[in-house]
Each structure stands twice: as structure tokens, then as C-alpha cells.
């Protein structure tokens, strides 16, 4: 894949048919850690970053777009990506034990939640384990993590403004938006400013936490995660991913490997990874 200079990104990527006209990609100001590539519309920022990883780019390579034609989230689920959101993926190459790698997605969720709260202090984002970001019980942002080619692609989709065309989301959560207002025939100057702030704040928060995670592991973030944890001390039903069995219990938190701590009916706390179970329902 050809790696373009910053000035060459204006029209890279295919524009979706019938999509609103977008004058230009965002132009966030970020630290030298990030090699930022900004686009108006692409098929998938994840695919761009994954191809870059295969080509051997160093960590910090980052792609951000205002629209995607083929965006996806965890476990390949479709992530609708119309104008109104910000879709960002970045490459990291952490040298850590394999069991530590899944916790990077939890660290990313903390970075995204913190960044969005900086942009809008009243949104009070919470985290749905392992790594979705909620606001007022609606899905505000989704995060994916894929390991390949000696590195990791972290993808983040944020609902900033409501798109003109209504869309549906998989799962039991409705959609939430960071800001009031609807995107109709393109982005206003104010909307572009806010979306630029989202990317800048998110990458700044991620860079800071990534460095700490490399040195201290996820244990250094457990208290922060607990403060934003939407499930704490709630009774839940959990389904095994590779079977039909359902587990009932009270969610007590997460451990240093990012596993959900579930107290069963006899008082035993059992750790469960996101590769083993997913939460199907909560008692409010």
C-alpha cells in the first residue's frame, strides 16, 4: 500500500453513492507519535491500518475518516458509518505477553471515554464491558481490536452528531450522540471543529494510557475502569460464546487481565474473558 503524505489525502478513498458532499477531511493537530492520514470517505479505516501493518509500518500509523462504506466492529459486526460520526483506526506494536494483549481494548475504552468527556463534560460516559462506551444508556462509541502482522489494529467509531438518515444498531442498546444537532447536507464549520477536537483528544488520551499500559499493565487502570463500569454490582445473565449455556450472577468488576468477575449463587467469584462470554441481560 502506498503511504501518502498529509497533503495528498484530500480525495483518497471512494465516496459512497448518494453520500452528502464533504469538502475535505479533518485536519487534527496531533503529537509526533501519530502518523495521521485523514480521509473524507473510505471503505474501512480498519482495513487501511491492517494493510499498513502488513506493509511493516511502525506503530502510530493512524487513519481517520468522516464516512465509511464497510465499517465493522468487534467480531466483524457491521458498524454503520454515515456522515456525523468519526471513524479512526491506529496501529500499535506492543511487546507484551499474549495474555495481556486483550486488556488493550479496555484501556482504549478508557481513553475514548475520557476524551469524549473532555469535549462535552456533561456526557458522563460509562463503559459496557469489555469496551463499548455508553451515554445515557445509549451506545456512544464502539471499539475493536485485531492482532496481525506483529501488531494490533485498534478501531474506534464515535457517534458525534445524528446523521440525517436514521440507522439501526445491533444489540440491545440504542444510539447516543455526543452533541445535539443533525448532519444534513454536509458539515458546518462548528461541527467540523467539534469532530476535530474528538480526534485530537482521543489520540492524546490513548497515547498517554498506552505508554502507562506498556510499563504497568492493566492493573494500573482497574480503579479508573471501575469508576466508569456500567455493570458493577448488577445481576446479569451471560451466554457462553461457544455454546447454549447461560450463566447467572452478580458482576463485581474486572481483574488485572480484563476478565469479568462474576459472583455465582454460592458466593464464588469466577473470572470470565470476553472470548468466553457476553452479557445478554442486566437487572436494572
Where are each of the predicted segments found?
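N-terminal lobe of the biotin/lipoate ligase/transferase fold
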Residues: 1-120, 282
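Long, positively charged amphipathic alpha-helical accessory segments at protein N-termini or as interdomain linkers
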Residues: 2-17, 21, 96-98, 102, ...
Amino acid at each position: 500500500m502506498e503511504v501518502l503524505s498529509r497533503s495528498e489525502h484530500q480525495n483518497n478513498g471512494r465516496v459512497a453513492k448518494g453520500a452528502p458532499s464533504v469538502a475535505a477531511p479533518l485536519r487534527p493537530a496531533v503529537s509526533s507519535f501519530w502518523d495521521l492520514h485523514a480521509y473524507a470517505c473510505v471503505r474501512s479505516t480498519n482495513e487501511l491500518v491492517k494493510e499498513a501493518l502488513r506493509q511493516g509500518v511502525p506503530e502510530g500509523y493512524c487513519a481517520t475518516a468522516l464516512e465509511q462504506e464497510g465499517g465493522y466492529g468487534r467480531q466483524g459486526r457491521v458498524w454503520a458509518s454515515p456522515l456525523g460520526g468519526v471513524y479512526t483506526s491506529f496501529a500499535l506494536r506492543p511487546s507484551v505477553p499474549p495474555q495481556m494483549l486483550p486488556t488493550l481494548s479496555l484501556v482504549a475504552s478508557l481513553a475514548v471515554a475520557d476524551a469524549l468527556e473532555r469535549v462535552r463534560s456533561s456526557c458522563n460516559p460509562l463503559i459496557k464491558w469489555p469496551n463499548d462506551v455508553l451515554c445515557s444508556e445509549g451506545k456512544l462509541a464502539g471499539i475493536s481490536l485485531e492482532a496481525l502482522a506483529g501488531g494490533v489494529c485498534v478501531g474506534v467509531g464515535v457517534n458525534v452528531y445524528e446523521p440525517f438518515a436514521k440507522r439501526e444498531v445491533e444489540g440491545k442498546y440504542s444510539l447516543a450522540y455526543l452533541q445535539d444537532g443533525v448532519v444534513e447536507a454536509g458539515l458546518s464549520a462548528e461541527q467540523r471543529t467539534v469532530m476535530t477536537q474528538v480526534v485530537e483528544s482521543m489520540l492524546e488520551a490513548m497515547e498517554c494510557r498506552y505508554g502507562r499500559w506498556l510499563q504497568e499493565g492493566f492493573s494500573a487502570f482497574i480503579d479508573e475502569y471501575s469508576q466508569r463500569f456500567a455493570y458493577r454490582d448488577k445481576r446479569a445473565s451471560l451466554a457462553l460464546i461457544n455454546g447454549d449455556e447461560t450463566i447467572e450472577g452478580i458482576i463485581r468488576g474486572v481483574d488485572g487481565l480484563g476478565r469479568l468477575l462474576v459472583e455465582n449463587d454460592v458466593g464464588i467469584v469466577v473470572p470470565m474473558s470476553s472470548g468466553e462470554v457476553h452479557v445478554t441481560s442486566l437487572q436494572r
